[in-house]
Design a protein with these regions (language model features):
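An N-terminal hydrophobic leader/cap segment in hydrolases
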Residues: 1-8
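Flexible "cap/lid" subdomain of the alpha/beta-hydrolase fold that forms the substrate-access gate
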Residues: 2, 15-16, 28, 64-98, ...
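A short loop-to-beta-strand scaffold at the N-terminal edge of the catalytic core in hydrolase folds
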Residues: 11-20
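Conserved HGGG/HGGXW glycine-rich cap/lid loop of the alpha/beta-hydrolase fold
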Residues: 19-69, 90
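C-terminal alpha-helix
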Residues: 94, 291-295
Length: 296
C-alpha cells in the first residue's frame, strides 16, 4: 500500500471510502478502479503522481471494499449512470470543482460519463477503454465470435446459476478473470490477494449482477438515475482533453473500434501499450501515470 491516508465522505446515497496521497494543494486526480479490482491497482501509479505534486484520490466504487450504501432500501444498482453520479457526488463531498479523471473498466466508464455530461468537472480524462460508454439500445447486437467468447462471465451473470456462482466462488471466479484478462501479466495471481477482501463487500454480488443485467436491458434501473440514463442514451461526445490507453494484450473484448475517435471532440491522444492486459494501472503503472501527468 502506497497511499498515505484513508478517508470517507458521505454522499446522498453512499458512505464512500477512499485512499489518498500527495499534497491537498496539488492538482486533484481521481483514480477509478474497475471490476473485479479495487484501489490497490493504483498503488504504484499514485506514488509517481504524488511525487510530481498531484493530490491523488482513489475511491472504492459502490459494492467494493469499505464503501457502503446508507439506506437498506436503496436499490443495489450497478448501472452506469449510478457510477457517474457517485463520482459527481464524491467530487461535491470533497469540495472539488474539478479534477483529472483516470480509470479503467467500470471506473473508466464513470470517468467518461462525467467528462461527457459534466465536462466542467473534468480537467482531463485518461480512459483505458476508449469511449467506455454502454449503448444499451444496441446491446442485442452480437460481436464477432472471438469477442463474444470473452464475455462468457457476463452471460453467466444473467442467470441465477451465475449469481450463485459469484456468491459462492467470488474469489476463485474473480482471480480467474484477473488471469485471463491479463494473459501476459505473470504477477496477477500474486497481486490478487491484496484486492480480494474488497470483493466481500455485502453489496458486491447484488451490484455486480445488476450491472451485467442492466447493460443488456435485462434489469430495470434505479429511477433516480433515469434522467442521466436518457442523456447517456444519446452517446454524448467527450469535449475535454483526453488520453486513450489501449491494452495490446487485453483478454476481454476486442481491439478499440477506430470509429470511437469521433466521440472525442477535444484534444486527443491515443497510446497503444503492447503486451499489457486489462488491468493497465497495475500492469503498467508508469505508462498510466505518464498519461495522467500529460494532462496536469
Amino acid at each position: 500500500m502506497t497511499f498515505s491516508s484513508t478517508g470517507s465522505v458521505r454522499t446522498p446515497v453512499l458512505d464512500v471510502a477512499y485512499e489518498y496521497t500527495g499534497e491537498p494543494g496539488g492538482v486533484p486526480v481521481v483514480l477509478l478502479h474497475g471490476f473485479p479490482y479495487d484501489v490497490r491497482a493504483f498503488d504504484d501509479a499514485a506514488a509517481v503522481l504524488a511525487d510530481r505534486g498531484a493530490f491523488v484520490l482513489a475511491p472504492y466504487l459502490r459494492g467494493f471494499g469499505p464503501t457502503r450504501f446508507r439506506d437498506a432500501t436503496t436499490p443495489r444498482s450497478g448501472q452506469q449512470a449510478g457510477l457517474a453520479q457517485d463520482l459527481l457526488d464524491f467530487l461535491d463531498a470533497l469540495g472539488l470543482d474539478d479534477a483529472v479523471l483516470a480509470g479503467y473498466d467500470w471506473g473508466g466508464r464513470a470517468a467518461c460519463l462525467v467528462a461527457a455530461l459534466r465536462p466542467g468537472r473534468a480537467r482531463g480524462l485518461v480512459t483505458v477503454d476508449g469511449y467506455n460508454v454502454q449503448d444499451i439500445a444496441a446491446s442485442g447486437e452480437p460481436a464477432p465470435p472471438d469477442v463474444e467468447r470473452t464475455f462468457w462471465y457476463q452471460y453467466y451473470f444473467h442467470s441465477e446459476r451465475g449469481r450463485r456462482g459469484l456468491e459462492r466462488n467470488r474469489e476463485e471466479l474473480c482471480e480467474l478473470l484477473w488471469r485471463t484478462w491479463s494473459p501476459t501479466w505473470a504477477g496477477a495471481s500474486v497481486a490478487f490477494p491484496a484486492s480480494a477482501p474488497s470483493l466481500h463487500n455485502p453489496d458486491f454480488v447484488d451490484v455486480v449482477i445488476h450491472s451485467y443485467r442492466h447493460r443488456y436491458g435485462l434489469a430495470e434501473g434505479d429511477p433516480r438515475y433515469q434522467e442521466l440514463e436518457d442523456l447517456i442514451a444519446a452517446q454524448p461526445p467527450i469535449p475535454v482533453p483526453t488520453v486513450v490507453l489501449e491494452s495490446g494484450a487485453d483478454g476481454v473484448g476486442g481491439p478499440l473500434d477506430p470509429q470511437e475517435r469521433e466521440h472525442f471532440t477535444g484534444a486527443y491522444e491515443h497510446r497503444l501499450l503492447p503486451g499489457i492486459g486489462h488491468n493497465v494501472p497495475q500492469e503498467a503503472p508508469e505508462a498510466f501515470a505518464d498519461a495522467v501527468l500529460s494532462l496536469l
